[in-house]
Amino acid sequence: FRSTAAGRCLPVTCCVFPRHFRVSSSSILPSNAKVVGGCKKNRQIAVEAAQSLEVDSQQPMNQEEVSEKMRQLREKIRWMLQNMDDGEISVSPYDTAWVAMVEDIGGGGGPQFPTSLEWISNNQLDDGSWGDLRFLIYDRILNTLACVAVLTQWKMHLHKCQKGLRFIRENIDNLENGNDEMMPVGFEVAFPSLIQTAKKVGIKIPTDSPFMKNIYAKRDLKLRKIPMDILHTKPTTLLHSLEGMEGLDWEKLLNLRTDDGSFLMSPSSTAYVFRHTKDELCHQYLLKSVNKFNGGVPNVYPVDMFEHLWCVDRLQRLGISRYFQVEIQECLDYVYKYWTNKGICWARNTNVQDVDDTAMGFRLLRLHGYDVSTDAFKQFEKAGEFCSFPGQSTDALTGMYNLYRASQTMFNGEHILADAKEYSTNFLHKKRLANAIVDKWIITKDLPGEVGYALDVPFYASLPRLEARFFLEQYGGDDDVWIGKTLYRMLYVNCDTHLELAKLDYEKCQAVHQLEWESIQKWYRDWNLVEFGLSERSLLLAYYIAASTVFEPERSRERLAWAITAILVKTIASQRQLPLETKGESLGSILENEDGGRLIEFLINTIHQLSSEIVVAEGRDITQQLSNTWQKWLKTCKEGGDDDLGEAEARLIVHTLHLSSGLDESSFSHPKYHQLLEATSKVCGQLRLFQSRKQVDVDLATGTTFQIEAGMQELVKLVFTNSSEDLDSLTKQSFFSIARSFYYTAYCDEGAINSHIDKVLFEKID
């Protein structure tokens, strides 16, 4: 390998792969091995091939403007992560109207929160409505009716009221055509209550349409599920929608406040209770919210847990989390501080939990080494079925989607996660078959694409660059809108800044990968490797797997070491498939002919070149370690059965990757290292065998085996649990990365892999 001016490492001299070879079990590839046969011609070819692998160091890889732009974007995102508080969220006109309805508790006759009334008067849209710029009929009607009602109550801005009423009259019939899946949270309770409130100030809304009758029926069903005695004594989701409800016992309800003085973090619900109780804790909560948002209030606040978790998730899936490891650790430390064995909600210290936040929190915490219990899912499960909130009538698709994602991080014996995986998988498959991938909590750019990717490429098979490439198309940035009581935006979660950095980063990585691939192709052609049975598709697959896993530009040495090792393995191991009458000649007399000399020369040369890079970078020689690693693999290739090849290949790639990365020698003798190596090689062996059988057995077309799944679960536990004396997390995760690459090629069919290769390595981002 050679280092370019751009700081990358590219192979100078690599090995070529002959069709025939002989293995000596007593002395395989010693560091002072002599090449047998007349190889002067081969050496000349080697020099020419080496030159073909060099990339012009004068090429303008480092574009100063792009680099500066990326630096600015990173700093902007880092500032967001470092300054997270209770959540950056857009204002809800509906909730602001309920806050503005509160009369001065001092008896002055005016509004208690005049700035809220001012916010409403300043934020009417041109068509007379209030609401998010994304038009959703439920959202616009609810927001507009609430704002007209409060302006009418205070006898202000008659012209704005008339304009708003005109919008309602012209559009209310369109509620019939709305998608029930996108109906705002608690709409079936909030809208009838708001109609009654509007009626008290002289605004009449017809309630005899089929839609309205259906809404009232849904309200009655929900109230039957949570009767009044339960409402007053146990925390339920109805605490989020108390506004306008009659016949409530206010003193009993005050016992169900959260620590911040709110009722399930709902400004509108809290404002309604405050109107009747003048409770000081409610007052302080509302005052804090109004001051934070300059008169307006969100539909829910705080949203700190939601913001911390979803921001980390987005950065990871976009492939840029490596820039913010310190900040991500701080985010997850914050979440873990408030984690409970009953799960979590969108805010800290809540008395109601939901499966969506719980699943997202569980998955991210587990994958970062935190100790989290599956008990968190118990209250969402009943007889093998799962719900978003205990007692609710419908499931949110994204809640089941995140439950599905969380279930794939299960350890052996975690039965509730096994049940969750089965239920959520079936739920999502049915929705996809029915073309019904629509969610009640978010309107995103490509939710069907997100769900489809998760189902088609499960966690064990999801290579980092592959996931990032798909999510770059699915993530809408600023355009993604959440559905609460009203539509709202999470400004740090769905953000064009994230998307812009992710695209620039991906393009930078892709450019490096394309240059490396061009060099490898030229090397392949110069050596005419097709003569040795190596197809260009196999060459490309080996590089793609390595580049999709070890993708960072600065890790070129590791990436190419992995790819070249896999290419060598593929070529040499393919000789085992020769007919019996020729195999003896292949394995027995290879060193006596010219091709055998080429093999030995290139294999030894590869070892020395890999080692020389480490000598330059780390100041230590790994030649003997690499040689020993290859000796073990070659011995298995000669003497072992098909069952052994996958295990041996995994061990070879693990050791080559770690030696190339400069991993400290003491790590190789660490007890955890041996555990991880055994678990990884075992499951990789099973995967290679399964992959071979799958090619001839149509019954194995989908899924894997119980033994493979159990092996992956064991490996996940070893990798993602921490102990007092442990390997560093990056080293542990490299074992999972290698197992993942084996799982990917065994799980995905050839057509899917070919399309993935094209998408990841060559397709431009729109």
From Swiss-Prot:
GO CC terms in record: chloroplast
Pathway assignment reads: Plant hormone biosynthesis; gibberellin biosynthesis; Secondary metabolite biosynthesis; terpenoid biosynthesis
Q: Which gene encodes it?
A: CPS3
The compartments listed are: Plastid, Chloroplast
What GO terms in the biological process aspect are recorded for it?
gibberellin biosynthetic process; miltiradiene biosynthetic process; terpenoid biosynthetic process
Q: What highest taxon heads this organism's lineage?
A: Eukaryota
Q: What is its EC number?
A: 5.5.1.13
Which metal ions or organic cofactors does this protein require, according to UniProt? Mg(2+)
Q: What is this protein called?
A: Ent-copalyl diphosphate synthase 3
Written domain comment of the UniProt record: The Asp-Xaa-Asp-Asp (DXDD) motif is important for the catalytic activity, presumably through binding to Mg(2+).
Single annotated GO MF? magnesium ion binding
Q: Where is the transit peptide?
A: 1-30
Gene3D superfamilies referenced in this protein's UniProt entry, alphabetically: 1.50.10.160, Farnesyl Diphosphate Synthase, Terpene synthase, N-terminal domain
In which tissues or organs does this protein occur? Accumulates in leaves, and, at low levels, in germinating seeds.
Q: What class of enzyme is it?
A: isomerase
Residues involved in substrate binding: 222, 440
Q: Which reaction does it catalyse?
A: (2E,6E,10E)-geranylgeranyl diphosphate = ent-copalyl diphosphate
Q: What function is annotated for this protein?
A: Involved in the biosynthesis of ent-kaurene diterpenoids natural products such as oridonin, miltiradiene, eriocalyxin B and nezukol, known to exhibit antitumor, anti-inflammatory and antibacterial activities, and in the production of gibberellins phytohormones. Catalyzes the conversion of (2E,6E,10E)-geranylgeranyl diphosphate (GGPP) to ent-copalyl diphosphate (ent-CPP).
Give the originating organism: Isodon eriocalyx (Plectranthus eriocalyx)
Q: Which InterPro entries match?
A: Isoprenoid_synthase_dom_sf, Terpene_synth_N, Terpene_synth_N_sf, Terpene_synthase-like, Terpenoid_cyclase/PrenylTrfase
Q: Which UniProt keywords apply?
A: Chloroplast, Isomerase, Magnesium, Metal-binding, Plastid, Transit peptide
